[in-house]
Amino acid sequence: SYQGKPKNLVIILQESLGARFTGYLGGLPLTPNIDALAQEGWAFNRLYATGTRSVRGIEAVTTGFTPTPARSVVKLGKSQTDFFTIADLLKMNGYQTQFIYGGESHFDNMRSFFLGNGFSDIVDQKDYIDPAFVGSWGVSDEDLLKRANDEFEQFHKEGKPFFSLVFSSSNHE
């Protein structure tokens, strides 16, 4: 088993971005920055979070749940605590855990679900100071990723490993 310094883990959930638009996945070269990050770090090209809505992808990535015809687990009242998530696992191993979103995290019960299931901190729309652009789903991806980078740099200064789930929404619908 690995005995070195713990690696940081960042998962970027890019709303409505399919492989056909992502260069490193064999699609059109429309994502040069994502393509560059894929070359510098670990990028998984056989990961698929199924679902008919964004919240289904979120629950699949964080919990491993497969989609069901019922309401999303994130939205259910009794799922707001005690579900095992990747954040729980990493938190038990000394990681800082964080959800970063450009919109309002109370939407679809995300705030309650994440804080009750392993995420220690949430950054959402109210935490952005003078964003360059705010649309109907929240701040722009540029604002979101600048803030995410600031958070990563702060965690690095603290010398603690971190897990951050970054969820974009600016190209929703």
What residues fall within each predicted segment?
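Soluble catalytic regions of membrane-associated enzymes that act on cell-envelope
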Residues: 1-173
